[in-house]
Amino acid sequence: MSKVKRVYVEKQAPYAVKAKELKEEFASFLGIKTVTGVRVLVRYDIENLSDDTYQKSLNTVFSEPPVDTLYEEEFPYGESDRIFSVEYLPGQFDQRADSAEQCVRFLNENETPVIKTAMTYVIEGTVTDEQFESIKSFCINPVDSRETGMVKPETLVTVFDEPADVKIFDGFKDMAEAELKELYESLNLAMTFKDFLHIQNYFKNEENRDPSM
């Protein structure tokens, strides 16, 4: 079972400015006039947060009850609605997630939450597959974002593989040229043999040791 909790937050109709703008832009810029409604939800995936602090944060950190509607895990939508979600590319700074983590720590300084966000778009009306792809391209900036799936991850915590044992090239600095050439060819390196010779000279004369990788 996933340790990750998921929350969707949607602006209530009077405050859903972005959703209204997108509907108009799909018609004016993309020429798609069959979209009858657009919904925009902020998706929060949350891990490493106690149940008590999680409950406190729902209507303080993740949503504002007067203007937002909050859904836990899933949200209602029509059978014919088209849905897609957009997340930041790995390495891109997620300002919304960072702010949420800081706000949670204000509620409880002992918490160390991991939060990841995405934007979920619901397209209501009748659109073809081609039109839907145009809508996705319009909403996704490939420089910093990408489409992401709807399946909740098992964890948000990144686990790095244990590094492989370091290999020492015994005898490298004192190898004869013929033996060195044989090693060079076996490694398929993106350098010339002349460069490889320079490396040997460096380890022999400067480092006085065999290299590792």
List the model feature ranges, each with a label.
Residues 1-213:
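Core nucleic-acid recognition elements
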